[in-house]
């Protein structure tokens, strides 16, 4: 049986910000981005400014890697309809806050935004999405590229490397079918466990350091409280969804009653009403009588 590990979002808040645990985040980023990633430092992020209402709902961490790129890793537990706008705001904020006043635009840092979403963000069949910026010709359909001088100055080969890059991992869309090493990480995000045959970078360290039974008494209590808050959020969302469905059902029932009574008052025979609305004749009689006896 796989050991019980702490959730990645809680680990991001409490454990992964320490330099001794950078190798865990480095492992995840290396598997996602397909290159070796070294973390230089953890920078201040929005998590430190969150309110009591949303601190259990969202966790984010801002990383600077050895290539001087900024990497925003954000984990979101529940739905926000304007979340795509939030992603844009986050990358824009990171750019403006990390360029010194009076310095040239060429010093604008590349930003990589990674969202680990535990809700159905947008509409799509996949569970990992990657977004970049390209410029395509309106008439020739060619892709705009950097000049030789720009490649030399920016140390980049393509225009999209200058602009923010977005990754979205839809954990709720992942069906536990592991096909590669990135899937091993997503399996951990969803299930808080690691299978014995997993070999993705960083997961060995996760297995060693994020073991739930290794938490000290204070952290164990806080972690239990954190899980309870997540359950409360999930329960509240379930209740809202059920209430919405009830309202829809009541609206449909009201329309059905109005249709039955309207047809009856216009002299349409009960058998024809029943056949037209695909209900029984007894139901038609009950609905008509319920309105007459009001």
Where do the protein language model's features map onto the residues?
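Conserved single-residue anchors adjacent to enzymatic active/cofactor-binding motifs
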Residues: 1-220, 225
């Amino acid at each position: 049986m796989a050991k019980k590990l702490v959730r990645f979002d809680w680990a991001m808040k409490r454990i992964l910000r320490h330099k001794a645990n950078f190798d865990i985040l480095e492992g995840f980023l290396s598997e996602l981005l397909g290159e070796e990633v070294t973390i230089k430092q953890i920078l201040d992020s929005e998590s430190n400014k969150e309110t009591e209402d949303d601190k259990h709902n969202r966790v984010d961490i801002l990383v600077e890697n050895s290539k001087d790129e900024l990497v925003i890793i954000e984990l979101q537990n529940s739905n926000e309809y304007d979340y795509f706008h939030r992603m844009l705001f986050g990358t824009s904020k990171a750019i403006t806050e990390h360029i010194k006043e009076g310095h040239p635009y060429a010093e604008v840092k590349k930003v990589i935004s990674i969202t680990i979403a535990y809700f159905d963000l947008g509409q799509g069949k996949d569970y990992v999405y990657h977004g970049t910026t390209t410029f395509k010709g309106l008439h020739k359909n060619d892709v705009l590229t950097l000049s030789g001088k720009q490649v030399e100055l920016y140390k980049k080969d393509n225009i999209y490397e200058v602009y923010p890059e977005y990754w979205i991992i839809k954990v709720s869309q992942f069906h536990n079918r592991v096909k590669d090493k990135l899937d091993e990480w997503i399996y951990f995000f969803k299930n808080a466990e690691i299978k014995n045959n997993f070999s993705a970078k960083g997961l060995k360290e996760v297995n060693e350091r994020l073991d739930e039974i290794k938490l000290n008494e204070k952290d164990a209590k806080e972690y239990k409280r954190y899980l309870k808050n997540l359950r409360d959020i999930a329960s509240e969302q379930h209740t809202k969804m059920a209430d919405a469905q009830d309202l829809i059902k009541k609206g449909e029932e009201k329309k059905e009653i109005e249709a039955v009574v309207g047809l009856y008052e216009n002299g349409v025979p009960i058998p024809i009403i029943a056949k037209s609305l695909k209900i029984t004749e007894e139901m038609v009689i009950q609905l008509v009588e319920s309105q007459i006896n009001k």
